[in-house]
Regions:
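Glycine-rich flexible loops
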Residues: 1-99
Length: 99
């Protein structure tokens, strides 16, 4: 899934929310809506659902990690190696991890 940005708060039932998320649509698969919740999208409903399930799982892991004292940040070199593995495996996704 890659990184998940946080969109600026928008008043419910107004154009503020779509205006704030529009810039993220071409480059991301998911977004957190400040003070609202999460949103995922894909070519079909089932794929979008699976992305939401993944996002919720990662959020739970992050929460538990923080409760246990925090995680260890990966080095830039390690992250680049992971991106290279992703490219070699031709994993799909529109997010910035497609370097």
């Amino acid at each position: 899934m890659g990184s998940v940005p946080i969109a600026e708060y928008g008043t419910p039932s107004t154009a503020e929310i779509p205006d704030h998320i529009e810039k993220y649509l071409p480059n991301y698969d998911a977004i957190l809506l400040e003070s609202h919740g999460a949103l995922t999208w894909s070519a079909d409903l089932l794929s979008a659902y699976h992305k939401m399930e993944s996002l919720e799982f990662y959020a739970e892991v992050l929460y538990r990690t923080q409760m246990l004292g925090g995680g260890k940040e990966l080095s830039g070199e390690t992250i680049e190696k992971l991106y290279e593995v992703r490219r070699k495996m031709n994993l799909p996704g529109k997010h910035p991890a497609n370097l």
